[in-house]
Amino acid sequence: MKRVKKLWGMGLALGLSFALMGCTANEQAGKEGSHDKAKTSGEKVLYVNNENEPTSFDPPIGFNNVSWQPLNNIMEGLTRLGKDHEPEPAMAEKWSVSKDNKTYTFTIRENAKWTNGDPVTAGDFEYAWKRMLDPKKGASSAFLGYFIEGGEAYNSGKGKKDDVKVTAKDDRTLEVTLEAPQKYFLSVVSNPAYFPVNEKVDKDNPKWFAESDTFVGNGPFKLTEWKHDDSITMEKSDTYWDKDTVKLDKVKWAMVSDRNTDYQMFQSGELDTAYVPAELSDQLLDQDNVNIVDQAGLYFYRFNVNMEPFQNENIRKAFAMAVDQEEIVKYVTKNNEKPAHAFVSPGFTQPDGKDFREAGGDLIKPNESKAKQLLEKGMKEENYNKLPAITLTYSTKPEHKKIAEAIQQKLKNSLGVDVKLANMEWNVFLEDQKALKFQFSQSSFLPDYADPISFLEAFQTGNSMNRTGWANKEYDQLIKQAKNEADEKTRFSLMHQAEELLINEAPIIPVYFYNQVHLQNEQVKGIVRHPVGYIDLKWADKN
């Protein structure tokens, strides 16, 4: 039987993550015969696949899976998600919380070190968090700093840096005051956006994060080689405070975006983990070396409400109702995903003990006849005799192409609508989507911390994750209220109202909720894949 790990009931821990999946890569990445060298030297070397070139190793800038997966292993925050996916002491050895649950005081470990030998100080955290919020920095993850009192005002240009309530009281004491109590803040600070930055290094070389020979980290591993668009090598860090826990000597990350090539490399021993290609899922999913782990997040499509014809709500809803999520997961992706009929994924427990998704139910379902009615109504409202030309854009990757083709065919069959497909390389795609250059595009979302609000805040007006042009004052107010509501029952009610409004106005089409399906070398143990968060190799071992 396959190894299936169900992790939701353990209480999700925070982590970060937005993860639009990547596109192109060098398919020869990592094929250098280094495996044989590792065997003869007796080194424990883990071979994994990052799929694509990281966007950036500058903590608040990367803000995607291909950057933060490796970064989570070469840097570390005040807390780290443990094997049970709950936050545990990391750079901070302890902390205390005020009676009003708004002020946290963290004590930095005396033996916390950077890879260059400098001590990690409370000042490095104060510097990093204010750097993340600096409006001149333009960090997409800056909204995560809005938990801090004065953070949003500073980032929006309405406040001053000195008014951001995070202060290094001395080298080992960091004090931070929140806008409102947040029960999940200890998980938030495990997020890569909250990683420290060595102030002296950053001021001496503002591009310290761009190359392996200038990178300065503080995690279990140190970055030793970065062959751009090819591979990343990291080695066990001798300066890490908990180095005795780290069993691996090296980790080599390939950059191979094609899932079939990824699988072939696993079969030939060039990778220790691999994805399961959809076309092989029927024969592979029942193997003993397959791990299936729940993961928060979903695959979906975005409409640009500023481009015709998607300024019309009824036309958007018609497209959304024409999509059959069950067909896609059964016949296209074929990796045991759950169809998504709302935006917030399963795995978040309410005060009444129910799962948020179970309580909220299915908010949109395939309905061809209703979709046709809505399309006709929308076209009349816009005085369309014929819809404007429609292009669906996706990032260049076989998996994205297959889903886009299925959507294209479904819209043709159900609504008689012709949709043109277009694709582009990952980094260009990402920048153009942020700039609202697409009419209709593929997307994905991983929550930044383990709470439904992490999903829902993404569609507030002006949020860097919105990328649809959609704005709704009522929705913004519901999110603001939920973020500041102390009563959990009321808070969850506000979040349900917000999700219903989002799905009803349809700036998006949910497709499926994520899981993590991996083949894994049976000699490898201890890789931790968090339902909310990034792969953690601190505890990994290889016989």
From Swiss-Prot:
InterPro entries: Peptide/Ni-bd, SBP_5, SBP_5_CS, SBP_5_dom. A lipid is attached at C23 (S-diacylglycerol cysteine). It comes from Bacillus subtilis (strain 168). GO terms for cellular component: ATP-binding cassette (ABC) transporter complex; periplasmic space. The keyword Ligase does not apply. Belongs to the bacterial solute-binding protein 5 family. Disruption phenotype: A null mutation abolishes the ability of a proline auxotroph to grow in a medium containing the dipeptide Pro-Gly as sole proline source. It is a lipid-anchor. The lineage of its organism: Bacteria, Bacillati, Bacillota, Bacilli, Bacillales. This is Dipeptide-binding protein DppE. Residues 1-22 form the signal peptide. Probably part of the ABC transporter DppBCDE involved in dipeptide transport. Keywords: Cell membrane, Lipoprotein, Membrane, Palmitate, Peptide transport, Protein transport, Signal, Sporulation, Transport. A lipid is attached at C23 (N-palmitoyl cysteine). The gene is dppE. It is found in: Cell membrane. Induction: Nutrient deficiency conditions. The keyword Transport applies. Transmembrane segments: none annotated. Gene3D superfamilies: Dipeptide-binding Protein, Domain 1 (3.90.76.10), Dipeptide-binding Protein, Domain 3 (3.10.105.10), Periplasmic binding protein-like II (3.40.190.10). GO terms for molecular function: peptide transmembrane transporter activity. One of its GO terms (biological process) is protein transport. CDD domains: PBP2_OppA.
